[in-house]
Amino acid sequence: MRSAKLKFEKRRSRIRHKISKTSNRVRLSIFKSGRHIYAQIIDDSKSITIAAASTLDEKRKKSHCNIEHAIKVGEEIAKKAYAAGIKDVVFDRGGYKYHGVVKALADAAREKIKF
């Protein structure tokens, strides 16, 4: 039987492989820890991070990874992307299942940028 970490890594690599086929768009990448959630907009062709937002920002220093704060992070990353002139991204859920905080962040970001 496979361990949970191995299943996660397999899901993650499968998602990245599918995303690599759409190299003409930038990628909205999600990372979740036990306490915080992070979002980055990455241009893989230039290997640079264009915008980033997380619950670690000064405004939300004591906040944790829950749906309420994931919505705020999603709105913030969408605002930063729109300011940078990005209107179209590929969503990289990073091996996480699409529910809870990942879904909340994605839905909040969809209001300003197109997936």
Curated annotation (Swiss-Prot):
Natural source organism: Rickettsia rickettsii (strain Sheila Smith)
Xref: InterPro entries: Ribosomal_uL18_bac-type, Ribosomal_uL18_bac/euk
Family: Belongs to the universal ribosomal protein uL18 family.
Protein name in the entry: Large ribosomal subunit protein uL18
Known function: This is one of the proteins that bind and probably mediate the attachment of the 5S RNA into the large ribosomal subunit, where it forms part of the central protuberance.
GO molecular function: 5S rRNA binding; structural constituent of ribosome
Example of a GO biological process term: translation
A GO CC annotation given for this chain: cytosolic large ribosomal subunit
Keyword Translocase applies: no
NCBIfam families named among the record's database cross-references: L18_bact (TIGR00060)
Entry keyword set: Ribonucleoprotein, Ribosomal protein, RNA-binding, rRNA-binding
Subunit structure: Part of the 50S ribosomal subunit; part of the 5S rRNA/L5/L18/L25 subcomplex. Contacts the 5S and 23S rRNAs.
Gene3D superfamilies per UniProt: 3.30.420.100
One Pfam entry name: Ribosomal_L18p
